[in-house]
Amino acid sequence: NLYQFSNMIQCTIPGSDPLSDYGNYGCYCGYGGSGTPVDELLRCCQVHDD
């Protein structure tokens, strides 16, 4: 979910703002999702959306 994603990014990249930096990234990051993921980040988001 988005909360877990946010925590993971903040742990990996201290000082980042994951929801504003990645909230609308690609077709799966953010609320809902569809389409074909084109990179590992989107595949991760797809797994958590499904």
Curated annotation (Swiss-Prot):
PANTHER family: PHOSPHOLIPASE A2 (PTHR11716:SF94), PHOSPHOLIPASE A2 FAMILY MEMBER (PTHR11716). It comes from the Eukaryota. It is found in: Secreted. It comes from Trimorphodon lambda. Inhibited by EDTA. Expressed by the venom gland. GO terms for molecular function: calcium ion binding; calcium-dependent phospholipase A2 activity; phospholipid binding. One of its GO terms (biological process) is arachidonate secretion. Binds 1 Ca(2+) ion. Its main location: secreted. This is Phospholipase A2 trimorphin. Belongs to the phospholipase A2 family. Group I subfamily. D49 sub-subfamily. Pfam families: Phospholip_A2_1. Its cofactor is Ca(2+).
